[in-house]
Amino acid sequence: MATKAFQKIYTQLEAITKATVALRAQGISNDELAVVDGRLAQVVKTKGDLVTLQVFSGTEGIPTNAEVTFLGAPPTLKVSDELAGRFFDAYGKPLDGGPEVEGKEVQIGGPSVNPYKRKQPSQIIPTGIAGIDLNNTLVSGQKIPFFADPDQPYNNVMAQVALRADVDKIILGGMGLTNDDYLYFKQEFEAAGALDKIISFVNTTEQPPVERLLIPDMALTAAEYFAVEKNEKVL
């Protein structure tokens, strides 16, 4: 994300912790992105003119006179049909070596669709996995978290759900996946010929853990685009 020439540069930090920095700045909004000493950060708190920024890659080595530039907007995602079949990082940047996506730029973490205006979810999405279909039935429009210990075959279960579900699009958000897990999903979807209906946002163990906080909002933004604007069945 490029820094504009007219943006003010701050060079005096009030405080530095392991994950955050604080400084005095005017006219700053919550969730706004910034660059601190060349590292991407996000506003997590404002109190008067005291602004606290969470630095995604950590603050180690950042001096008190580091340059800070505010980018004037929160994280965004470009949404279009070009998202289909692609793997992205927590910032919506391609992980798969493909080109940047062109489309409408949408703020992530913004207001979601009002649940009172939605029809009550009732359309069953069969997965072919008896333990899920009988005991924890999935329905269209549902967000589904998978929690598992590292030694559990969660990637196999998630891939089966994605490949068996009768839907138009599958939005997968992976937090703290190993590089092997990421490659497993990519290879499974490609081998099954289903890659064109999968959109994945992945944070691997090699990337800063705090970036994982962006993954759910990225996935939800993509899901609402395909479900609401494209009128597709999305899981």
Stretch-by-stretch model annotation:
Residues 130-157, 163-235:
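Switch/coupling sub-region of P-loop NTPases
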